[in-house]
């Protein structure tokens, strides 16, 4: 019978092999979807094995990308949409605050302005918000949804535990009638030097960059770009939306209630990789909202996010930027 050290070495070698295999499979899947994004348009049924199926299969052996020292994550959020209801009364808010005090002990009131697109009428209302002392975690109970937002991502296990506590507390104190949609979103702003002649192609997959060479041959200069790819997931009701673009400034802005971990340069270049993984009932029903449902669905929605991100960046970005604390 092998000793403990030999067993450890076998496990490590097996894990290394699986990581390499998964990275290769994810890269092939990413290349396939970006060669012909129409095959994954929402509402169509691809005749080949879908990109998301491949990613979700390889996730049996690969977990999400690590939290890098110089992490590009600007915001991670989950939104649990439910039938519109009255906001929790003050006494219920006090209990929610107490139940979630480990993460968000501060009660704030946010003024929200909305515009009616049909009439042009402006309306304003206030909503309660629970925030962390460092203002990098916020929980909001809106009339039609509850959300958790973090700008200093603690990792999936801790994030998931906050989600579980949020849902449990809300349903114990001021329950909502059901679940319409669950959305999990990771917004990355990649910042790196563009001194290399290849520009962003040095840092991200070249297939993300569009027909730059062809445009340059016609003496056309790209001034803005934004791409959206929508995919059906392997499970009924699952979908994934990938948004990516080169841009300047920032997508995520600090607010009085939610501060960015690092304030970006006002006019700095960045590359956006925004992954939005979502579920809604495939039969158009409204199932009961409880922590068990959210745990199960959120785990499944989270599954492809890390491998997809890792397949869209280069090893140069990983080693020269993301793994270097304090560098941009």
Predicted regions and their residues:
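Long, compositionally biased interface segments
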Residues: 268-328
